[in-house]
Amino acid sequence: MSSQQSKVVGLIFGGASGEHDVSIRSAATVAEGLSSGANKERYRVQHVYIDRQGRWWGDATARQVLSSGQALADDGSRPGFSGFPDGCLEVEIWYPVLHGPNGEDGTIQGLFSLMQRPFVGSGVLGSAVGMDKLAMKAAFSAAGLPQGPYRPVLASELVSNSQLLEELETQLGYPCFIKPANLGSSVGISKATNRSELQAGLDLAASHDSRLLVEKGLQVRELECAVLGGQHLKASVLGEVSFDADWYDYETKYSSGLSSTQIPADLPEAISSRAQHLAIEAVQAVGASGLSRVDFFYEEASGNLLINEINTLPGFTSQSMYPMLWKASGVPLEELVHQLLELAQ
């Protein structure tokens, strides 16, 4: 394929969210896949970087950020969007690698839709439902999918409901986990084993979001399954995450040596098969497409398999499960990014 026939791919990363650094690392992996093998001829990459202040930067600056792995320092100029950098209007397919708010919540997907350009991943609805943990769990419930005990909490209840702590203790007990509804990579999440930790966890989560989720802590194995496709979805082999820390927090996820993965997970065939079917049902329940990672809790003693959450724009770093699960399923990085671009709509 000649360069004249190469499709221009807009690889957009960074973003004004707490997962900015993870996005840079994910984009570096995607860029590697786009420059490998036959993809070098198939695609011409236009890199676009969004800094922490929401400013958009063109190819030269974006490449510098990718090569250094470091976020761009704030130069004090006016924050927010001030126009597309050079090259954006040439882009034929957008490949968003933006994690967290303004990246995987339907906002950037809405912009691409307005631009009438195809893009990798879920559309506005699937992204928004998958991002908001309360909407996601409601969608899972409506589809009859198995979940652990939880309670939605509004930040306003921390002031208006004097019985909140007692109600949570009665309904869920300890340990429990407190999460903001709209952040990923375990940002703003805490574990509570007593009332003071519960109060502190609610305050922390409320500092990130007005919608919160409190979940019962369970003695489980943590499994993950990658899903790929549009109308026809396929599920990867299962992976298992183990960690030395008390729980799988942000530092554990992204610090070398604190967590380990086993791919494929050592599971009975019936459990693996059921998880793969449930993963596809979870993607359909929220209306996602393209790529998703579905996380499970497996209660080994009872054999129960519970859906924890879906991530419609999963991490793509060198230690992220999504690309590793597909590699173990016979889809290497080069082919994976190509398939995702082929699925763009």
Curated annotation (Swiss-Prot):
Keywords: ATP-binding, Cell shape, Cell wall biogenesis/degradation, Cytoplasm, Ligase, Magnesium, Manganese, Metal-binding, Nucleotide-binding, Peptidoglycan synthesis. Mg(2+) 2 binds at E309, N311. GO terms for molecular function: ATP binding; D-alanine-D-alanine ligase activity; metal ion binding. Its cofactor is Mg(2+); Mn(2+). It catalyses: 2 D-alanine + ATP = D-alanyl-D-alanine + ADP + phosphate + H(+). The keyword Heme does not apply. Binds 2 magnesium or manganese ions per subunit. Mg(2+) 1 binds at D295, E309. It comes from the Bacteria. It is an enzyme of class 6 (ligase). PROSITE patterns: ATP_GRASP, DALA_DALA_LIGASE_1, DALA_DALA_LIGASE_2. This is D-alanine--D-alanine ligase. InterPro entries: ATP-grasp, ATP_grasp_subdomain_1, D-Ala_lig_Van_CS, D_ala_D_ala, Dala_Dala_lig_C, Dala_Dala_lig_N, PreATP-grasp_dom_sf.
